[in-house]
Each structure stands twice: as C-alpha cells, then as structure tokens.
Curated annotation (Swiss-Prot):
GO terms for cellular component: cytosol. GO terms for biological process: regulation of DNA-templated transcription; regulation of RNA stability; regulation of translation, ncRNA-mediated. Keywords: RNA-binding, Stress response. Belongs to the Hfq family. GO terms for molecular function: RNA binding. RNA chaperone that binds small regulatory RNA (sRNAs) and mRNAs to facilitate mRNA translational regulation in response to envelope stress, environmental stress and changes in metabolite concentrations. Also binds with high specificity to tRNAs. Residues 9-68 form the Sm domain. This is RNA-binding protein Hfq. It comes from the Bacteria. Homohexamer. InterPro entries: Hfq, LSM_dom_sf, Sm.
Amino acid sequence: MSKGHSLQDPYLNTLRKERVPVSIYLVNGIKLQGQIESFDQFVILLKNTVSQMVYKHAISTVVPGRPVRLPTAGDAEQSESGND
C-alpha cells in the first residue's frame, strides 16, 4: 500500500461505514453532498437522490458533516484479536 493511501483509505472507509453525510468540493468549485457508498483507488461513489461516480483527481476537499474518529493501529489490533 502506498503512503498516500495509509490515511485516505481508513478515513473514507470510516465515513462509509458510519454513513456520515459529506460535502465533496471539486477543484472547479462545485459542491457535491451525500454519503460515501463505495470507493477505490480512483473514484468515490457518492449517494444522494442518485449515485454519482466522482473521480478522485477532480476532488479538492472532503468535509464530513460531523466529527469522525479515525481508527488507530491499536484499534485495529484490538478488533483483530477480538475475532479469535
């Protein structure tokens, strides 16, 4: 995993799992709102009244509608050991 994804993926995944409403600002200034349905290396699926595929290279900023807590390395170890 590249260094850039070590923060991006857990952040987007937390927003997705907790169904946090987000505002996504594009580089051209357009504001999109909805919930993150899914994402991969290149795109984010944003769901509102319709689903939109937003290319990450077009995104300037992702703003959550409420504060989110990112999982730490210790949290990941605890959840893995809890599955034994």
